[in-house]
């Protein structure tokens, strides 16, 4: 296990943002079910990408890893061998997409994955697939891994919960591929930008659908065309670097490169929100330029950029006014319960933060170095790293291996911008800073 030891730091300079995980995984999946050869440049290298590649190879896709791109020849006949076992690793997208994909086949397919996936909900997607005729059997408790899917689904109509956008994204993929027609309505749609990203891919690859309000219809039997695509930078990952730059004491700007302002990624909206709150952020060509600046807090609807909750919580600790992050129910079902995880860890640093109904209440307060835990969640680990860079005293963050999920070179990127972050194995020990209780007694919070 790895740990980060972080000293107070200011950053500036220029850095390339890692490729988008959301685009990478969708591109690999769609190239693998296309009839022909596609090329994906600048794909993210991560455990989730590898889980998607391995699952797609079981479909019969031929995937070659070249020096700067993936060359993928899709399976000519969409099928799986009998009794196939798909291991989704820790990837929510692989988990949901292949659960839905398995339902289009007559062969039984078993879906399994890491212990972390056990806490990721799947029941709403399963209910929708059952309404189309799929059946499920479980090794343990219902709606938990591992389970076996038996199809094929047949034409019809269903509803699917919108609490997590991946349910609708997975269903859209299955309904496009299976023999239709199909239609479904998203009930109480959340995380809308991420479902829109899936629809963007369907449109780019000539996979037809129609929309009426929150109801989507698919003719079925549609395979994507082949394509050549360059994955742009990940706005979700860029948010951590942008936050570090905003809080920096440096008078010099930080350039975040490979970010296209026309990209369909949902977390791009976070940057526009920060601008409205007063942050000095500008888009220029394919870069985002960030200057150290003050910004206000506010009442912030988290649904459009739910993955940004941990780093926004950190930023709100340094805002000029209190903040209420609301409509964040989806953050409870990610790699960790992010509402609880970020609260527990920032409180160790002295933050005045508390959970409220599906959200957070945060009063600005100074932060102090502490010993913290990532909760095995990449976004918690990176958010705490930014907090630690702007705290008084050194901090240590345990179990940071998870950061490789989306930002494999996170430490290298920070240190290239003059941060003071060291990566160590877990035998490193250090005296933690004062506990939150001590800080409360001293009147800091």
Swiss-Prot record:
Query: Pfam families from the xrefs?
Result: EPSP_synthase (PF00275)
Name the CDD domains on file.
EPSP_synthase (cd01556)
Query: What Enzyme Commission number does this protein have?
Result: 2.5.1.19
Which PROSITE patterns does this entry report, sorted A to Z? Answer: EPSP_SYNTHASE_2
Signal sequence extent: none
Q: How does it assemble?
A: Monomer.
User: What name does UniProt use for this protein?
Assistant: 3-phosphoshikimate 1-carboxyvinyltransferase
Species of origin: Chlamydia felis (strain Fe/C-56) (Chlamydophila felis)
Q: Specify the taxonomic lineage.
A: Bacteria, Pseudomonadati, Chlamydiota, Chlamydiia, Chlamydiales
**Coding gene?**
aroA
């Amino acid at each position: 296990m790895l740990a980060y030891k972080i000293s107070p730091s200011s950053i500036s300079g220029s850095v390339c943002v890692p490729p988008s995980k959301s685009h990478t995984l969708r591109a690999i999946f769609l190239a693998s079910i296309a009839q022909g050869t596609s090329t994906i440049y600048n794909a993210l290298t991560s455990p989730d990408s590898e889980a998607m590649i391995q699952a797609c190879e079981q479909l019969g896709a031929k995937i070659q890893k070249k020096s700067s791109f993936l060359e993928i020849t899709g399976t000519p006949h969409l099928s799986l061998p009998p009794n196939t076992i798909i291991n989704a690793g820790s990837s929510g997208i692989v988990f949901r997409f292949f659960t839905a994909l398995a339902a289009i086949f007559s062969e039984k397919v078993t879906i399994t994955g890491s212990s972390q996936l056990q806490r990721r909900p799947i029941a709403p997607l399963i209910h929708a697939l059952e309404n189309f005729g799929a059946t499920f059997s479980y090794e343990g408790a219902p709606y938990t891994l591992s389970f076996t899917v038996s199809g094929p689904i047949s034409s019809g109509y269903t509803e699917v919960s919108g609490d997590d956008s991946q349910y609708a994204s997975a269903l859209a993929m299955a309904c496009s591929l299976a023999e239709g027609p199909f239609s479904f309505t998203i009930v109480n749609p959340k995380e809308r930008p991420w479902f829109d990203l899936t629809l963007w891919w369907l449109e780019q690859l000539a996979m037809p659908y129609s929309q009426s309000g929150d109801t989507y219809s698919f003719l079925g039997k549609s395979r994507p065309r082949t394509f050549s695509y360059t994955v742009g930078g990940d706005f979700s990952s860029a948010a951590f670097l942008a936050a570090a730059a905003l809080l920096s004491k440096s008078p010099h700007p930080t350039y975040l490169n490979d970010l296209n302002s026309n990209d369909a990624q949902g977390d791009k909206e976070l940057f526009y929100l920060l601008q409205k709150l007063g942050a000095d952020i500008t888009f220029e060509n394919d870069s985002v330029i960030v200057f150290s600046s003050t910004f206000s807090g506010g009442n912030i609807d988290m649904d459009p950029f739910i993955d940004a909750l941990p780093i926004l919580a950190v930023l709100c600790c340094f805002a000029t006014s209190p903040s209420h992050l609301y409509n964040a129910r989806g953050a409870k079902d990610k790699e960790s319960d992010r509402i609880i995880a970020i609260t527990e860890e920032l409180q160790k640093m002295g933050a005045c933060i508390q959970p409220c109904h599906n959200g957070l209440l945060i009063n600005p307060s100074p932060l102090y170095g502490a010993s913290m835990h990532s909760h095995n969640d990449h976004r918690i680990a990176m958010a705490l790293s930014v907090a630690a860079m702007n705290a008084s005293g050194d901090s240590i963050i345990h179990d940071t291996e998870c950061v490789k999920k989306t930002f494999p070179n996170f430490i290298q990127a920070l240190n290239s911008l003059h941060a003071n972050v060291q990566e160590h194995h877990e035998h490193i020990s250090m005296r933690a800073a004062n506990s939150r209780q001590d800080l409360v007694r001293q009147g800091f919070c």
